[in-house]
Amino acid sequence: MVTIRLARHGAKKRPFYQVVVTDSRNARNGRFIERVGFFNPIASGAEEETRLDLDRIAHWVGLGATVSDRVAALIKAANKAA
């Protein structure tokens, strides 16, 4: 099953997440099909907190991909801001 979820990157105590399309059987930070955005929970000042390619996310959801709870919340916030 294809899913859209967060993959953790960054340093210890400084998380940075990539929003990726991946097979649900792959490891959290393992192989992915496509990167569709990022989420920086500790962005400050002029740093961009979230960037999502909503067109590609809609494409994958149309093909049957499931979306994780956290990514769904990020999509909802991005749609509200746009």
From Swiss-Prot:
Gene Ontology biological-process entries: translation
Signal peptide, first to last residue: none
InterPro entries per record: Ribosomal_bS16, Ribosomal_bS16_CS, Ribosomal_bS16_dom_sf
Gene3D superfamilies per the UniProt record, alphabetical: 3.30.1320.10
Domain of life: Bacteria
Pfam families named in the record: Ribosomal_S16 (PF00886)
Coiled coil start-end: none
PROSITE patterns given in the database record: RIBOSOMAL_S16
Keywords: Ribonucleoprotein, Ribosomal protein
A single MF term (Gene Ontology): structural constituent of ribosome
Similarity section: Belongs to the bacterial ribosomal protein bS16 family.
Protein name: Small ribosomal subunit protein bS16
Protein species of origin: Klebsiella pneumoniae (strain 342)
